[in-house]
UniProtKB/Swiss-Prot annotation:
The keyword Plastid does not apply. Belongs to the peptidase M1 family. A peptide binds at residues 132-134, 261-266. One of its GO terms (cellular component) is cytosol. The keyword Protein biosynthesis does not apply. This is Leucine aminopeptidase. It comes from Dictyostelium discoideum (Social amoeba). GO terms for biological process: leukotriene biosynthetic process; peptide catabolic process; proteolysis.
Length: 606
């Protein structure tokens, strides 16, 4: 049983959804019905139970329009309401198919959906809609069995006002037009967990960026996006080489409006990304490697429950770093691993400080907990470290062969960690390596809170160069020997590490304003486009009290709404100029995604 869902796939399993919806921008609603096909898996099951959250259900019919009885449960504040639909008596035996149409509409409180007004878009001419269903928000878009343990196919028929375009995490199968609206149809033939259902509606244009890829965005950003993501096919090709053939057909990228609160979301066939990746020089294209790695880890082999999230994210980070290593030099794997370990350290400290240490176990107990509240780098980085440790026991070549085999064995399934463990043991016992792997303390790896129990040592000379520049040239020697050429040959990750090291190592004793001015005159950080540099540089300046950075910070805060940047920057600005932080937020809060504006308000004590 999935503790994050109220539904009953273990009794009556949903196999496909057919969404027939129209998009109403005036009311900020999706309206229509979903046809749910299900199959009885437990003899005598009387009801099909679906998850819903903040939906208005009007009625249920069978396919011949006869009414079907249903009721809604009491509301659970995190998991929503169960929609309990009576299965007709003749259809309650194992193997029988039950099809029901649920007529409903979403509401303004459906938190999977963000409705943007014209003014909140880049073009300012048309409204815009996008969804974010992970982890448990699909139930506020469509009544469904909203558990990653159950995979479904889906079709959709979406009516939108002209001249807007609809896209989904599915193959596009056509478009028909009437006087003032267009109908877009889609099909997703590969069963997916419901958190991967995605929709976007807006003034969208596309450019071809590869043999199976297009990039989509509002017209004003499409040329920049085309340039930035031109290397996408290389990442997919390395992924295929490492793992198995790419099965989804297309791999498109959707560049969202600036208020998209996340970095990226691996919706199948259509990765969603933030426009803060537009650096103008492809220096942030590596983020796409992560989303591409999800095409196998997560989207094909899926965590059965959210407590096993490391099966999605730990594996994805591992594959992402393998891809980056192959494309940018093997050292990049260790370099990124070292950075990741630092983030893991920070999060373990943070959760321990909040007395939530149990959430730092690789498989935490999420009973009654919103998976979003447990979110941290733990499943990503601790999961990654487990795989590095296992790799160190059996050797790189054999581990990569196992990984390929693991993906092909568990593709199209939802699994738990013990299945992964059992397959690892089975595979390497057969290969005569049972002694090497007998040392693994699986129980502690999976269940013990805190840092990884075994630590693989990562080595990166490039990281040392970046750290030395921060610690010796700038912190110790105050920049007296610094020159313009210091960072000329640095890779993106080195500049990020350089700035991170400065931030961390000067948190007690900030650099002086004079030192920062010198750094800026040599490296030109104030005017960079790269959002990762800008975010760190502004943090550093606020911390040192460099007043002239404040208007630049405001400019950055109101130009995008990615939580990774806006939350910490508002907090820093609030420390040095609370009036400016609060007035800026109050003036622009409607521009942010609802989740982001709630979080920032909390951070600012509003
Ligand atoms: Zn991910």
């Amino acid at each position: 049983m999935d503790p994050s869902s109220l539904s009953n796939p273990q009794e009556c399993k949903v196999t496909s959804l057919n969404l027939v919806l129209s998009v109403n921008f005036e009311k900020s609603q999706l309206q229509g019905y979903v046809e749910v096909a299900s199959q009885i898996v437990k003899e005598g099951t009387e009801s099909l139970i679906l998850d819903t959250n903040q939906l208005e259900i009007s009625h249920c019919n069978d396919v011949t329009s006869n009414p079907i009885n249903f009721k809604l449960s009491e509301e659970h504040k995190v998991f929503g309401k169960a929609l309990i639909i009576s299965i007709p008596e003749g259809l309650r035996s194992v193997g029988k198919e039950f099809i029901v149409r649920v007529y409903y509409n979403t509401t303004v409180d459906s938190n999977a959906l963000q409705w943007l007004t014209k003014d909140q878009t880049a073009g300012k001419l048309h409204p815009y809609l996008f969804s974010q269903c992970q982890a448990i928000h699909a139930r506020s878009l469509v009544p469904c069995q909203d558990s990653p343990s159950n995979k479904v196919k889906y079709q959709a028929e979406i009516t939108v006002p002209k001249p807007l375009t609809a896209l989904m995490s599915a193959l596009s199968t056509g478009k028909t037009e009437s006087t003032d609206s267009s109908v877009f149809t889609f099909t997703q033939e590969i069963p997916i967990p419901t958190y991967l259902i995605a929709i976007v509606v807006g003034d969208l244009e596309s450019r071809v960026i590869g043999p199976r890829s297009k990039v989509w965005s509002e017209p004003s950003m499409v040329a920049a996006a085309e340039y930035e993501f031109a290397n996408t096919e290389k990442f997919i090709a390395v992924g295929e080489d490492l793992l198995t053939p790419y099965v989804w057909g297309r791999y498109d990228i959707l560049l969202l409006p600036p208020s998209f609160p996340y970095g990226g979301m691996e919706n199948p066939l259509l990765t969603f990304v933030t426009p803060t990746l537009l650096a103008g020089d492809r220096s942030l294209e590596g983020v796409v490697a992560h989303e591409i790695a999800h095409s196998w880890c997560g989207n094909l082999v899926t965590n059965k429950y959210w407590s096993e999230f490391f099966l999605n994210e730990g594996f994805t980070v591992f594959v992402e770093r393998k891809i980056l290593g192959r494309l940018y030099g093997e050292e990049m794997f260790d370099f990124e691993a070292m950075n990741g370990l630092k983030h893991l350290h920070d999060d373990v400290d943070l959760f321990t400080h909040k007395h939530q240490e149990e959430l730092t176990a690789l498989i935490p107990n999420l009973n009654g907990i919103d998976p979003d509240d447990a979110f941290s780098s733990v499943p990503y980085e601790k999961g990654f470290n487990l795989l590095c440790y296992l790799q160190s026991l059996v050797g790189v070549a054999d581990f990569e062969a196992w990984l390929k085999s693991y993906i092909s064995k568990f593709s199209y399934q939802s699994i738990v960690a013990t299945q992964m463990k059992d397959y690892f043991i089975e595979y390497f016992t057969e290969k005569g390596k049972s002694e090497q792997i007998s040392v693994v303390n699986w129980n502690d790896w999976f269940n013990k809170p805190g840092m990884p129990i075994e630590q693989v040592v990562f080595v990166s000379p490039a990281a040392k160069v970046a750290k030395d520049l921060a610690e010796i040239t700038w912190i110790k020697d105050q920049g007296v020997n610094a020159t313009k050429d210091d960072i000329k040959s640095f890779k993106t990750q080195q500049i990020i590490l350089f700035l991170d090291t400065l931030i961390h190592s000067t948190s007690e004793k900030p650099l002086s304003v004079d030192v920062l001015e010198k750094m800026d005159s040599l490296y030109g950080f104030t005017d960079v486009v790269n959002s990762e540099y800008k975010f760190r540089w502004q943090t550093l300046c606020l911390h040192s009290g460099l007043k002239r950075i404040e208007p630049k910070v405001v400019e950055f805060l109101i130009s995008q709404g990615r939580m990774k940047f806006v939350r910490p920057l508002y907090r820093e600005l609030n420390k040095v100029n609370p009036e400016l932080a609060k007035s800026t937020f109050n003036k622009y809060k409607s521009q942010y995604h609802i989740i982001a504006s709630k979080m920032v308000a909390k951070d600012l004590g509003l």
